[in-house]
Amino acid sequence: VRAFARRLSKNPKEYARLAIADWVAKNPSISILSDGRIVGYRGLRSDFTAIHPGFGYVNGEPQSHDGHLDNSPGNVLSFPTELIDHDPSKVCSFGLHFGTFTYADGYAKNCKQTGNGVRVSVAVAPEDVVSSPLDSRESKLRTLSFEVIEQVAAPYAETVIL
C-alpha cells in the first residue's frame, strides 16, 4: 500500500489523484500490486483486441487509427500524452480505459463483433491515470498506459498481490 501511495503522489494532476482515490475507495475489491500499480480489468473481443477501434501504441509500436489494439497478455499499451483527453465530462474520448471487473464483464458479454468476448486484468500506474469519466459511476478510469496481465474469469480475490 505504501508503494501505491508513493506512486499516486507522483501523478501531476490533483483531480486525477482524487479520482483514483475515490475509485479505489468505492471499489474495495480492487487489487494493488506490490510495486504500487493498481489492477483493473478490460472487456475485449474474443481475439484480445479492443472492442472500439482507435490509435495507440502496443509495445512501443504505433497502431493505426482504425485498428483494434491488441490487448494480449504481456502487451503494454500506451497513448500519447499530448492527445489524451483529461476532461472527465467527455465520457468516451481519447485515451485508454479500464475499470472494475463488472465494467469489463459487461463489455465482454455484449461484444457484438465476435460474440462473447474475453476479460483481462491490467496493471496501471497511478501516476498515469488522467480522469474518471463522469458516465462511469466510478466504474472506469482513463489512463496513458497499462500492462495486460492475463485473461481472467473472475476478479482477483486478494487485495494486495505480491
State what each model feature region is.
Residues 154-162:
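Active-site or metal-binding loop neighborhoods of secreted/extracellular toxin and effector enzymes
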